[in-house]
Curated annotation (Swiss-Prot):
NCBIfam families: prfA, PRK00591.1. The gene is prfA. It comes from Shewanella pealeana (strain ATCC 700345 / ANG-SQ1). Residues 286-305 are annotated as: Disordered. Belongs to the prokaryotic/mitochondrial release factor family. Peptide chain release factor 1 directs the termination of translation in response to the peptide chain termination codons UAG and UAA. The keyword Phosphoprotein does not apply. This is Peptide chain release factor 1. The lineage of its organism: Bacteria, Pseudomonadati, Pseudomonadota, Gammaproteobacteria, Alteromonadales. PANTHER family: LD18447P.
């Protein structure tokens, strides 16, 4: 491993010990904000520090095995050769692990997220599929013990949703779900299809990180147009008699957010503002990323939200992830929320791409 990397790891080890000492300091414990920040830093350092300690131990084992191999005793020599192989293999694996742990972290990975699912081409079938996708993500969230809160729905005439927006809260939510942004295509025989023909429909999924209040960009109230209206259910029928639903338009960007799933106008307004902040932040982030990456686009990009990223083929029980050429024949389990079989390879591909970029640099 490069000396510069070893020095960086030694610095992190030193910082970890400093943070640990500070966490037991009475003054820090009394300052809850500082205590929380240091606790978060300690948990972020934990993995890399523990892996580096294992790496140091493996290097010691290697040196010890080398010394034993100089012995005259044939049995000791044989044992030392075996220990040398084990240590060498451990060092190689731990080096790879440390490289990944040292990759630049997306600052939003630990944030909660908003997930927006919209029916595209395919009419009723697209809306039904949007409902299926929402159920899939809900099941996945439950399996991770995350909280899911519906913020706005526009139901389809024959089931599912023309649009559904939800907030998912929990540990590392955005980091897991961010690569779900893009076009999702379904191929299946609709229940109303008497000839048994396969129809193709599509939905768009957008995943945005929640912007913590302390980091939220300031939104000028003069830039907002706020409309109130009655919340409605499927087919447009009104489900309450007060104007509790909220529509907020951000005039400079043209972004429009509606929230109608809460009974009070105050709650709908608060939720609409948090979604609006996330969308405006996403626009700003996209501008910055485009400027930074004008010469190079990430392989597992979630930038082009219209790009088809995945196909769900029901007759074949197949799910195909187009960005990494991965095809799995376990669609039933996938639609029940067992999606780590695609989520994890996407994260790994992104890490490999970042490592390659560092190598090029």
């Amino acid at each position: 491993m490069k000396d510069s990397v070893i020095r960086k790891l030694e610095g992190l080890l030193e910082r970890n010990e400093e943070v640990l000492a500070l966490l037991s300091d009475a003054g820090v414990i009394a300052d809850q904000e500082r205590f929380r920040a240091l606790s978060k830093e300690y948990s972020q350092l934990e993995d890399v520090v523990s892996t580096f300690k294992s790496f140091q131990q493996a290097e010691e084992d290697l040196e010890s095995a080398k010394e034993m191999m100089e012995e005259d005793d044939p049995e000791l020599k044989e044992m030392a050769q075996e220990e040398y192989k084990v240590a060498k293999s451990a060092i190689a694996a731990l080096e790879d692990e440390l490289q990944i742990l040292l990759l630049p972290k997306d600052p939003n990975d630990d944030n909660n997220c908003f997930i927006e699912i919209r029916a595209g081409a395919g009419g009723d079938e697209a809306a039904i599929f949007a409902g299926d996708l929402f159920r899939m993500y809900s099941r996945y969230a439950e399996s991770k013990r995350w909280q899911i809160e519906v913020m706005n729905t526009n139901e389809g005439e024959h089931g599912g949703f023309k649009e559904v927006i939800a907030k998912i809260s929990g540990e590392g939510v955005y980091g897991k779900l961010k690569f779900e942004s893009g076009g999702h295509r379904v191929q299946r025989v609709p229940e109303t299809e008497s000839q048994g023909r396969v129809h193709t429909s599509a939905c768009t999924v957008i995943v945005l990180p929640e912007v913590p209040e302390a980091e939220a960009i300031e939104i000028n109230k003069a830039d907002l147009k706020v409309d109130t209206f009655r919340a409605s259910g499927a087919g447009g029928q009104h489900v309450n008699k007060t104007d509790s639903a909220i529509r907020i338009t951000h005039i400079p960007t043209g972004i429009v957010v509606e929230c109608q799933d809460q009974r009070s106008q105050h709650k709908n307004r608060a939720q609409a503002m948090s979604v609006l902040a996330a969308r405006i932040q996403a626009v700003e982030d996209e501008k910055r990323r485009s400027a930074e990456e004008s010469t190079r686009r990430n392989l597992v990009s979630s930038g082009d939200r219209s790009e088809r990223i995945r196909t769900y083929n029901f007759p074949q029980g197949r799910v195909s992830e187009h960005r990494i050429n991965l095809t799995l024949y376990r669609l039933g389990e996938f639609m029940e929320g067992d999606i780590d079989c695609v989520v994890e390879p996407l994260i790994q591909e992104n890490q490999a791409d970042m490592l390659a970029a560092l190598g090029e640099g």
